[in-house]
Swiss-Prot record:
It comes from Caenorhabditis elegans. Required for the assembly of the V0 complex of the vacuolar ATPase (V-ATPase) in the endoplasmic reticulum. This is Vacuolar ATPase assembly integral membrane protein VMA21 homolog. It holds the Pfam family VMA21. Residues 1-33, 89-102 are cytoplasmic. Keywords: Cytoplasmic vesicle, Endoplasmic reticulum, Membrane, Transmembrane, Transmembrane helix. GO terms for cellular component: endoplasmic reticulum membrane; endoplasmic reticulum-Golgi intermediate compartment membrane; ER to Golgi transport vesicle membrane. Based on the gene model, may be part of a dicistronic locus. It is a multi-pass membrane protein. GO terms for biological process: vacuolar proton-transporting V-type ATPase complex assembly.
Amino acid sequence: MTTSSSSEPSTMATLFPNFRDQEVQSAVKNLLTYSLVILIVPLASMFLLKQFFFEGLLGVSANDALTYSAIIAVVLVHVVLGIWLFAATKQEDRKKRENKQD
């Protein structure tokens, strides 16, 4: 006994976005790029600053160097998020202007 409603489409195309669409490709590429940046930049800066800048150059103790570099990493996460939000709103504004011209 199957119950299917003609008003509810059951194709996969309705459940998942069309990845051949240029807008969807751009959004996925943007998401992957910022996801990698938000992982790599803070982690790399934390360990590089701790090892080479605070301990190596300034001669700060290991615990203090870790604290300072962690604070900078947190700030960098917020900077990357701010850049991502700015880029997203800028892209959204551009789409609205294009739709108004049509």
